[in-house]
Amino acid sequence: MPRSYAFRSAACLLLSGCVIAQQMPPAHFHHIHLNTTDPAAAIDFYTSKFDCERAKFAGEWNGVWAQKAWILFDKVASAPPSAITSSIWHFGWGAEDMKAAYQKQVDSGTKFDTPLTDISDLASFPGFYYAYIDGPDHALIELNTASHHRLGHVHLLSADPVAAGEWYVKYFGAIRHGKEPPSRAPAFYKGYQVGPSMSLQSDNINIIIFPKEFAPKAYPDSWKNRAAFDPTEGRVVDHIGFSFENLSDALENMRKDGVKVTQEIRTAFHDKVKFAFVEGPDRIRIELVEGQAKKE
């Protein structure tokens, strides 16, 4: 099936080189926020299938703690849109032994969107595999060969991957993998456009960015008569979040630089959480939170 060629996210996790300097003091990756019709069932799924644990965000909100970041859930009345038409493609965990990890998932009843697939040729790394899980509310979750089994990456799509990557470097202190300046030349794998691309690091999370042109080839039905991304808000993966030690300063710096602020600073959970929202490249919703992610 076409999406079985959508794999370079796995390769990027191991094939990264040197990094470019940060342009601003770094933020920290804070969370992935999902919409779901059944938060309790979703939490059961993630904590039983992957290396993560139940925890209460701010001591009050049931969620999933995955090493250094949160997975948070909003309950919605009907199934959230899950077609790959926004700039958030998927997120995923690593596996030291992909064959064993895949079989364990199969034996436990996990449904797969894409079965175990060998992409050693692409990765130039013998025994390199990936698979896509059909998660709660049809969230797409990748398992891929890695040197760990933690929550490891978020894979995005962009009309300009290089510019998008530079935006995350500038505003969130993400570190770009690669020795040479990023290439803007198109690159293809088995007919699918996978470049230009960017691979960035924010704490434990590898942020990988592929070109928008990948999506219509991999998901033609969803992209029929479509030219642009849907906003991520309201979809199964609603947004991602980054934290700053001083949210007010960070938000004002971004605002002065022309970043669109979509929600001003608010507080929640008896003022224990301070947050705001901005719009990032390709209509991605990004939450800014004060204070680094931690398990209560």
Regions found by a protein language model. Give the residues of each.
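N-terminal secretory signal peptides that target proteins for export/translocation
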Residues: M1-A6
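Bacterial N-terminal signal peptides
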Residues: R8-C18
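Terminal presequence/propeptide segments associated with secretion/organelle targeting
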Residues: I20-Q22
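Core segments of cupin and vicinal oxygen chelate
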Residues: M24, H30-I71, V76, D121-G127, ...
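Vicinal oxygen chelate
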Residues: A27-T37, N62-W65, P80-L157, G178-Q201, F242, ...
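Sec-exported extracytoplasmic/periplasmic mature domains
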Residues: T47-D51, E96-D97, Q103-T110, V169, ...
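Amphipathic N-proximal alpha-helical interface segments
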Residues: F73-A79, I141-N144, I209-P220, L288-V289
